[in-house]
């Protein structure tokens, strides 16, 4: 059966977590006919998902440029080209503004700004016949979430880099877009979402009445990378309308729910 991404080579960074958003995208892209290279830090998990989707893998620490370049080179060596680069790593750093440490600020800048920036720098020269860059961002790049200033700032910053890429490389047939989920049901968030009242506190702010899933994000990514898409430089808000409203404020939810929110990792 013909798929929307037949024979496109997709490199998905951030696909080492069991059933995380990157792995869900890898499965969906493979179903659409793409050739998959998954990347991340957990080699055992990468082996498992790459075997499942009939693809390959590369171990990569996004904070180290030599790992990023080696990963991209491996994808090109395996398939002779690169059509799609997806950046799905992140760290949901939570801290009151005045309490953010220099060490943590350097860490989140490396994970959510410098690393993705260098990933895009590595992918673009390999896209000889055009291609697609996708950044998994966050609704919090647009609307507030208490005690997440550094997280929100780095997400918003890399969104602007995406627009810059779209502007500078459009004439080479390269499109660049970002996707902004809100709170998303994943294995990583399952423990926190089990806290009494947490899901309801968030869900009431979603006009569509439910929390998002990784499958929602994967479907949007397939569209953005398909030949039928004419979007570039856009931030796709895949969050059920959350950005029409707001995230719950910390004082509006009880202590047990607030503690669970504090454990959530970002997209």
Describe each region flagged by the PLM.
Residues 3-36:
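Canonical Rossmann dinucleotide-binding motif of NAD(H)/NADP(H)-dependent dehydrogenases/reductases
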Residues 96-97, 101-107, 198, 202:
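Substrate-binding pocket helix/loop in short-chain dehydrogenase/reductase
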Residues 120, 154, 162:
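Active-site helix of classical SDR
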Residues 125, 167-171:
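Alpha-helical segment proximal to the catalytic Tyr-Lys
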Residues 126, 210-238, 243:
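C-terminal substrate-recognition "lid" of short-chain dehydrogenase/reductases
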Residues 170, 175, 231-233:
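Short, small/polar-rich loop/turn modules that mediate ligand/substrate recognition or access, typified
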Residues 232-267:
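Short C-terminal tail/terminal secondary-structure segment
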């Amino acid at each position: 059966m013909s798929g929307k991404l037949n024979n496109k080579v997709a490199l998905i960074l951030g696909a080492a977590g069991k059933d995380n958003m990157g792995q869900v995208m890898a499965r969906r892209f493979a179903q659409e006919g793409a050739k998959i290279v998954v990347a991340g830090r957990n080699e055992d998990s990468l082996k498992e998902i790459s075997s499942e989707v009939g693809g390959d893998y590369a171990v990569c620490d996004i904070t180290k440029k030599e790992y990023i370049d080696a990963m991209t080179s491996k994808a090109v060596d395996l398939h002779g080209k690169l059509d799609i680069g997806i950046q799905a790593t992140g760290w949901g750093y939570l801290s009151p503004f005045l309490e953010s440490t220099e060490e943590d600020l350097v860490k989140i800048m490396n994970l959510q700004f410098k690393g993705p920036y260098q990933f895009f720098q590595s992918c673009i020269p390999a896209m000889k016949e055009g291609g697609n860059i996708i950044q998994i961002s966050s609704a919090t790049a647009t609307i507030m979430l208490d005690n997440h200033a550094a997280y929100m700032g780095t997400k918003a910053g890399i969104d602007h880099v995406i627009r810059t890429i779209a502007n500078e490389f459009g004439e080479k047939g390269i499109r660049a877009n970002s996707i902004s989920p809100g709170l998303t049901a994943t294995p990583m968030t399952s423990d926190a979402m089990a806290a009494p009242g947490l899901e309801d506190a968030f869900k009431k702010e979603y006009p569509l009445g439910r929390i998002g899933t990784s499958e929602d994000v994967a479907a949007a990514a397939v569209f953005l990378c398909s030949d039928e898409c004419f979007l570039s430089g856009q931030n796709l808000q895949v969050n059920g309308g959350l950005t029409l409203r707001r995230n719950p404020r910390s004082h509006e939810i009880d202590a047990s729910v607030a503690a669970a929110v504090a454990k959530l990792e970002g997209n």
